[in-house]
Structure formats: structure tokens, C-alpha cells
């Protein structure tokens, strides 16, 4: 989460440099150029909701009971909204109607770079299992930057819907291999490949989809333009009391 003081934020990708070549004695240094890559824009969106307590309810001494209850419900609705907005990044991660700056979905086998397409998705989609987790861990460890250099990232946490919370626990925490008669260790657990464990997200809509967060320095972001505020005011024409909540942020 990062704060923002503008109408939108932008991330400008820079490719960095390639490997350093051998410098022969007396020869000039070879100079490389960091190239400008893709630009990602995060346009802040306002979310607001309110409710009204009638003049009659106020006069009948129902303010304290109704007001406190509905104010709590309003705060809950604002929190739920943000949870759903962020979760939708993952719910739409395979949906071609929601492509990113590189023209592909968030999870794709064909993210374009200077050295060719790169993938953050298994070549063949697979349900959550010990084998599929091992495959994605290998793929993560082989990740390259835009100049084709290994970046040595590793998995940190597994993010799952509620439907997979028991299966994920068995896979990550079993001492031996899960669902097999083999007397072999659970390599994922023994190697400590998911130090932050499994995180259950109640807002994921696909019961089979699972995601791995790595220790890469850049990833999914939330820019907070305006924190949630709660205000109340009276309406002159009706003598009703109005309550409202407002918040502005962006994700991507």
C-alpha cells in the first residue's frame, strides 16, 4: 500500500543493464543503455455510500440505537468494498477483458519482454497439489528480468479461496509427501519454500484458482489517494440526518 497525492500514479518500467563483458587491457569500457519499458497507470476511483435517519426517528429517541448500528454497517460496507476491489485483481487474472499494460492478463504464459515472452503461469493449468506447487516453484526460481538475467526470486506465500484451505494445509505442513504411500519427505516443507504459509482469501470467486506471491520487489499495488472519511449533516427540507462515507484509491 502506497499513499498518493495526485489524480493517478504511474509506474515506468526500466529494463536495467545486461551482463558486464570482459574488458581487454587498454580497451574502452562498453557502455549499455537502460531502455524504457511499459508504463502502468493507476487511476484513482472514488467509492462512497450513505444512509439517512428520518426526523421522526431522531425525535423518537431512536438515534443512538439506529445511528450506531448503521454507522458500523457503513464502515463494514466500505471495508468489504476494498476487499472485493483488490480481490478482483485475482478474480480477473485470467480474463482477457482485463489486460494490463503489456496487453496480456495478469497471469499469462506470454508476457512480452525484450528477450521474448515470459510466463507467470503453468504451461498446463493444474489444480492445487504437491506436484503443481513444485512445478510453479521451479518456474519462479527460473524467472528472468527484461534483459534475460536470472533474478533469483522465491515463493513467499500461497493464496487460496476457502475451498482449498484444508488441501493447502495438508500440502504445506505434512512432514511426508501428501496423499501418497511413499515414505519420502515433503520437500516443500523441508526447504521452507513458503515461509509466510497459506493465506485464505474469502473474496476469491474461483474455487479452484490459487496464486503464489514471491519476494520480487515489485508486484500488486494499492495507492491510497484519500482515506475513508465519515461525515454527517442535516437536510434542511426534510429535517432528516444524512450520513456518508467516502474513500478514493486505485489498484493494479
Which residues make up each language-model segment?
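Short alpha-helical interface patches
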Residues: 27-32, 53-62, 162-166
Amino acid at each position: 500500500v502506497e499513499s498518493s497525492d495526485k489524480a493517478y500514479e504511474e509506474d515506468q518500467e526500466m529494463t536495467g543493464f545486461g551482463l558486464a563483458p570482459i574488458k581487454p587491457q587498454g580497451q574502452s569500457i562498453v557502455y549499455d543503455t537502460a531502455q524504457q519499458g511499459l508504463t502502468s497507470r493507476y487511476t484513482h476511483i472514488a467509492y462512497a455510500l450513505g444512509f439517512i435517519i428520518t426526523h421522526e426517528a431522531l425525535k423518537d429517541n431512536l438515534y443512538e440505537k439506529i445511528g450506531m448500528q448503521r454507522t458500523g454497517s457503513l464502515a463494514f460496507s466500505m471495508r468489504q468494498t476494498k476487499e472485493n476491489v483488490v480481490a478482483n485483481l485475482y478474480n480477473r487474472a485470467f480474463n482477457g477483458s482485463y489486460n494490463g499494460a503489456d496487453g496480456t492478463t495478469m497471469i499469462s504464459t506470454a508476457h512480452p519482454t525484450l528477450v521474448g515472452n515470459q510466463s507467470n503461469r503453468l504451461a498446463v493449468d493444474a489444480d492445487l497439489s504437491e506436484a503443481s506447487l513444485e512445478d510453479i516453484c521451479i518456474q519462479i526460481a527460473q524467472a528472468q528480468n527484461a534483459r534475460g538475467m536470472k533474478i533469483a526470486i522465491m515463493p513467499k506465500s500461497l493464496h487460496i479461496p476457502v475451498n482449498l484451505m484444508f488441501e493447502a494445509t495438508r500440502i504445506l505442513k505434512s512432514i511426508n509427501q501428501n496423499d501418497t504411500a511413499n515414505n519420502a519427505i515433503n520437500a516443500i516443507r523441508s526447504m521452507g519454500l513458503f515461509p509466510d504459509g497459506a493465506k485464505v482469501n474469502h473474496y476469491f470467486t474461483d474455487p479452484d484458482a490459487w496464486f503464489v506471491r514471491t519476494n520480487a520487489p515489485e508486484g500488486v499495488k494499492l495507492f491510497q489517494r484519500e482515506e475513508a472519511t465519515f461525515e454527517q449533516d442535516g437536510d434542511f427540507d426534510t429535517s432528516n440526518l444524512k450520513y456518508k462515507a467516502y474513500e478514493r484509491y486505485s489498484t493494479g
